[in-house]
Amino acid sequence: MTPRHFLRDDDLSPAEQAEVLALAAELKKDPFSARPLEGPRGVAVLFDKNSTRTRFSFEVGIAQLGGHAVVVDARSTQLGRDETLEDTARVLSRYVEAIVWRTFEQQRLEAMAGAATVPVINALSDEFHPCQMLADLQAIAEHKGSLSGLRMCYLGDGANNMAHSLMLGGVTAGIHVTIAAPDGFTPAPEFVAAARRRAESTGATVTLTTDARAAARGVDVLVTDTWTSMGQEDDGLDRRTPFWPYQLNADLVSLADPEAIVLHCLPAHRGEEITDEVMDGPSSVVWDEAENRLHAQKALLTWLLERQS
């Protein structure tokens, strides 16, 4: 049987995304109600990039599902060096029930998935952060109810993985997504096109703008992320100057709907992309969002493994 993979947000149809989110809500209420990895059965969790939330949430989640996480960093494997990714995928598929990988280029994940006979999950790539988006959607649903028809605004680096996932995952849920970013930091055109194609089937929309204030006006959800993503620290680009107008602060929050919520996938650079006042304020659901990485990823693993068996 060909495995189902989760490499980007639109790998799930709208109905499938809703199934995963419903299961995530159930698992949050009863963490041990699903045990698809009882045995324990193994899951490979591979890291080319450092992580806090991803590592803890996957390790704890796999244990709660009855399994054992085999956690390996890039220094400890031959991934893409002395052995091809395809050969590694074939071997790991004989050992584990799924492969979770936090890496750089999206094509590395695609190469792994192309040869694997077990599900491959994108735990973050340069292009997408789909597990985080599931957690975001779960948090939004908890605080806003139905997702369809909500208005969500992302402020900051529109070219980063969270902006891409917010577009694809958001419109899959029927959310109207606006990306507010300065010139030179807009989303990749191919991902904008993919999001708009998906939006045609859900009634959602994708809007791109350079006007942060106009983008924030009246929205239900405000989202931001770091201005400098992992691996960009030494690229020499001046990000603070163009991004200051996109800082998520009390002024921008005041433009949104009075019941609007604020999301940040963390880690946050307080005083840069988000102020302390907003991060710790009444609109923030950041900690619920972070917790939901555990529940959403457990639901995703369970859903994928059910289809594998």
Swiss-Prot record:
Query: Could you tell me what this protein does?
Result: Reversibly catalyzes the transfer of the carbamoyl group from carbamoyl phosphate (CP) to the N(epsilon) atom of ornithine (ORN) to produce L-citrulline.
Q: Which UniProt keywords apply?
A: Amino-acid biosynthesis, Arginine biosynthesis, Cytoplasm, Transferase
Query: Family, per the entry?
Result: Belongs to the aspartate/ornithine carbamoyltransferase superfamily. OTCase family.
Full protein name: Ornithine carbamoyltransferase
According to UniProt, the reaction catalysed is: carbamoyl phosphate + L-ornithine = L-citrulline + phosphate + H(+)
* EC id: 2.1.3.3
UniProt-annotated binding residues for L-ornithine: N161, D225, S229, M230
UniProt keyword annotation of Cytoplasm present: yes
Pathway field of the UniProt record reads:
Amino-acid biosynthesis; L-arginine biosynthesis; L-arginine from L-ornithine and carbamoyl phosphate: step 1/3
The protein's enzyme class: transferase
SUPFAM superfamilies per the UniProt record, alphabetical: Aspartate/ornithine carbamoyltransferase
> Listed GO molecular functions?
amino acid binding; ornithine carbamoyltransferase activity
In its UniProt record, which GO terms are filed under biological process?
arginine biosynthetic process via ornithine; citrulline biosynthetic process; L-arginine biosynthetic process
Annotated Gene Ontology cellular components are: cytoplasm
Taxonomy, superkingdom: Bacteria
Q: Does the keyword Acetylation apply?
A: no
Binding-site residues, carbamoyl phosphate: S51, T52, R53, T54, Q78, R102, H129, P130, C131, Q132, C265, L266, R293
State the organism of origin.
Answer: Mycolicibacterium paratuberculosis (strain ATCC BAA-968 / K-10)
Where it sits in the cell: the answer is: Cytoplasm
